[in-house]
Amino acid sequence: MKKPSIGFVGVGRMGANIARRLADLGYPIAAIYDHHEGTATSLAVELGSLAAKTLPEVTAASDVIFTVVTDDAAMRGIFAGDESLLKGAAGKVFINCATVSPAVHEAAEEAATAAGASTLAASMASSLTQARQGTLYLMVGGDAAVFEQQEPLLKDISSSLRHVGPVGHAGKIKALVNMVMNINTAGLAEGLGLGAALGLDLIVLKEVFSQTGANSRVLETDGDDMLAREHDCYFSAAHAAKDSGIANALAAAAGIAVPLSHATEAQYRKMIDLGLGELDKSGVAELTFPDRAGA
């Protein structure tokens, strides 16, 4: 069966690795666009693709377009105006992977439908390694028939794939996933930081955490990095602040108090203010350990 031609809009760390994965599997990567032209050109040379100068070029060259942009404003921008992705988009499919507000996903779906195109929101609960290996955890919202049509493609980049309902539900679930993850990360940083201040053996403390109710997935992924101050970026503090903010806005709209999430967002925004926003989220430990820059 012929594989669809694929376009990419937004080829930062995650987008680029998804593109590489699909290229490895023989999908034609037809066109690549990024706000930073050099980023698009570099990946296009690597994959033998067109480095598109405009968004309509991506649409024209591709059957399916993945968008992996940074925030609400970027997502709105690529679907708005006469020279957007929706120019000549009839029959095309957009798979929107960014963590953005659910209302933005819904607006993109409405605009695409009016242009004769289809959309899915494919929210990712994974990081760079999983994107490159094709083992993403994907929560997909959108029309069930469109999901079924694109399921073989989505399976090629994921190890866990589920359809979660309407397009906005994917964004809501992803916001809550990241809300809880960020709270766990900030809480772990406080626990380990307090342990350091109390003069405890942090290796022993971390082992005790792992064997008790203090255990978490974040302890496995970030605990050693917090101790070693190794904060190479897989998921940045700036993105953590953004995503906690999305969840907090949803909570406000629902009339639900989420004080822990607000405190967590404040910690990550403090990192940004201190110039630490591009550290990995584990870098929140720089605010909680004694004798570290942000403590």
Which sequence ranges carry the predicted segments?
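NAD(P)+-binding Rossmann beta1-loop-alpha1 motif at the extreme N-terminus of oxidoreductases
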Residues: 1-68, 92-93, 97-98
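Hydrophobic residues within alpha-helices
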Residues: 18-22, 108, 153, 194
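Rossmann-fold NAD(P) dinucleotide-binding segment
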Residues: 55-118
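Active-site-proximal catalytic alpha-helix in oxidoreductases
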Residues: 134, 138-141, 162, 166-198, ...
